[in-house]
Structures are given as C-alpha cells and as structure tokens.
Amino acid sequence: MLIAVERLLLKIGQPRSRADELIALRRRLRDERARKIDDDERALAREVLARKLAVSAELDAVSSCRSCATGAPWPRGAYDGGDCCAGVTADLFDENELAALVHAGTRVRDLAPPPGADEHAGCAFRGPRGCTLEVAHRPGRCVHYLCDTLRRELHARGQLDLVEAKLADLNRTMQQFTQVHQAGLDRDVLAPIIDAILTR
C-alpha cells in the first residue's frame, strides 16, 4: 500500500519521465536490498563508499563543475553545471553501482529528487542547484568522471596526481566489489537448480 502511494505521489509531483525513472530505480533498490549477501560483499560496498567519499573530499572546492554545461544543447545545457550528470538514471545507477550503494546503507528515503517544477534534464537527481543526493548516496561514477576542464583545474591546483591516485583506488575497489557481487548473483541463480538436481 505504501509503495503504491509513493508511486502516485511521484507521478503527481514530478515530470512523467523523472517519475518513471525514480519508480524503476526504487523498485530495483528494494529488490537488491532483499537479496541475502555475504560479509565480503557488504565490506567491499563500505570500502567503495569510503573511497568515493575520499575522492569527493578532494573535489569539494572545484569550480569547473558549476558552469561546465553553459550553452550546451539540451539536456546537457538545461542547467549551468553538471554536464556529466545529463545521463540516463538507470545507466548511472547500473546493477553494480546500485548494489554497492544499497549494501553501504542507501535506502529509498535517501533518493530525494529535485522539486517537481524543476525540469528533468538527465539524471533524475540533477536540478538547477546541482545534485539532490548526498555524496554517500551517489554512484561511484559520479565522482569518477574527470572531464578535461576539471583535469586542468585540478592540475592548476596541484591536486591532479592525488585525485587520480584516489580514483585508481576507487576503481580497484569497485572492480573487486563487482566480482563479488556478480558471484553472488550467479549463486542466487544456480542455487535452486543445484538443489533441484540434488533432490532428484
């Protein structure tokens, strides 16, 4: 009942395209949260979170991202900043990224969209004042993308090497998480088949 009300409120309060993306994402989040996972997967999800926050802390003072989309065609240019945020929500929150978020603590209540009056231009969480998600609840790829403009700014600040090293750590950890997560999904699929064979 509560999920039906939640969907109705999204459809009433948001542009249809954003509401559809949010409903699908929240459904996938609930499905992933219902999975039984092992301690290794949960520990790696928390490590992905820690490494993502470490990268984000280095990017906190950058100014490039506030105006990078100015003058770009729609949907990229709908807002001044966040050119790299103009992707499709389901692509940004792919299966592995969403699983890492869920098992590090992200819940449906953490996925708050911009006000409904704000145009849906790319990711469902992109609005005129930036992303509505706290960094902890954004996919790792949201801090992983370094465009040429941002790279130049980081180089001028003397931060580029440090940020690239932290991104490499994040990437390695996400690859480890993905391997463990995919192995868990394989077990989920194979377990009933193996049980059926063994009980014959």
Task: Specify the residue positions occupied by each region the protein language model found.
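Hydrophobic scaffolds flanking metal-cofactor catalytic centers in soluble metalloenzymes
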Residues: 1-200
